[in-house]
Amino acid sequence: MYEEFPDVITFQSYVEQSNGEGGKTYKWVDEFTAAAHVQPISQEEYYKAQQLQTPIGYNIYTPYDDRIDKKMRVIYRGKIVTFIGDPVDLSGLQEITRIKGKEDGAYVG
């Protein structure tokens, strides 16, 4: 499995928390860590994305996990990667999920 998914990513969700004074705050929290293969997009995909004005930077492949939600984001090597569109079950057999993502320019840690 290591050869197929050599990278490690952390999925985060944006959650509401009480601030202790009757108000609410929102913050990103770690949900779970997963093995993955993070691949920069090809020149062809980059060109198509530019034409459609859809900034994509990575294809992320990870074992299927029903906890993955399009409202999440991924931390990869300290970089924040936001989802572009919905995660896709590639085979329809709940084996591998593909996530298209883009860096938002921020770093964690």
Curated annotation (Swiss-Prot):
Its main location: virion. One of its GO terms (cellular component) is virion component. The keyword Transcription regulation does not apply. Functions as a stopper that is part of the head-tail connector and that locks the viral DNA in the capsid. Following tail attachment to the entry receptor, seems to open by a diaphragm-like motion, allowing the genome to exit the capsid through the tail tube to the host cell. During assembly, functions as a docking platform which the preassembled tail tapered by the head-tail joining protein gp17 can bind to. Belongs to the Caudoviricetes gp7/gp16 head completion protein family. Homododecamer. Interacts with the connector protein gp15. Interacts with the head-tail joining protein gp17. This is Head completion protein gp16. It comes from Bacillus phage SPP1.
